[in-house]
Amino acid sequence: MQTVKHSAMALFLAVITFTAGAHPHSFISLKTELVTDGTQLSGLKMRWTMDEITSADLLYDAGNAKPGDEIWKKLAAEVMANVLGQHYFTEFWHNGQKVKFMNRPTEYGMSRDGHQAVLTFVLPLAHPQPLAGQTYTFSTFDPTYYVDMSYAKESDVTLPTTLHNSCKIAVHTANLSEETLNFAVSLDIEDA
């Protein structure tokens, strides 16, 4: 085992996804890339792929629209309004303190991937955070557990290639209590 003594950065990112194993009503597959300039973390570039049932209304409204057509911009704005109303469904922590986000994403869009709608956006931090020697944790989840938001594999959270040797990522999935799972099962669409 080789110890790297001169490492300028040690970033351990614990990504926690809360998955309601009992009976969520909607599913979103997450992918996230950290946005950095090499020394500071400025945001999270997210890709949310919705399940086919959740996607159905959006794709119906989009019809045969081509990527970049006006309808995709309109649909993306509608979905982002909901995401913003829920604080991006994301919490970001540093040293036990919540890190604030900017009120609006710096970019966002919607597209089709087969029979699934895909929302992409950059979730900007209100203030860039230093990377060197720091530990950050972020969680993306629906607090009602109506929507299962999860990473399929650890490689769904990525760093820029320039940080691969100096930073680490770990993805952790929450283990929900029986009480929480039962609550998730009891939810109706009006409760979400």
Feature-to-residue mapping (PLM):
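Bacterial N-terminal signal peptides that target proteins for export
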Residues: 1-9
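N-terminal signal peptide c-region/cleavage motif recognized by signal peptidases
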Residues: 17-19
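Early extracytoplasmic/domain-onset interaction patches
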Residues: 23-56
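Residues that act as N-cap/strand-start positions at coil-to-secondary-structure junctions
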Residues: 26-28, 86, 132
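Ordered hydrophobic segments in well-structured contexts
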Residues: 29, 43-47, 91, 118-122, ...
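Structured domain cores in non-transmembrane regions
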Residues: 52-129
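Mature, soluble, non-transmembrane domains
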Residues: 95-192
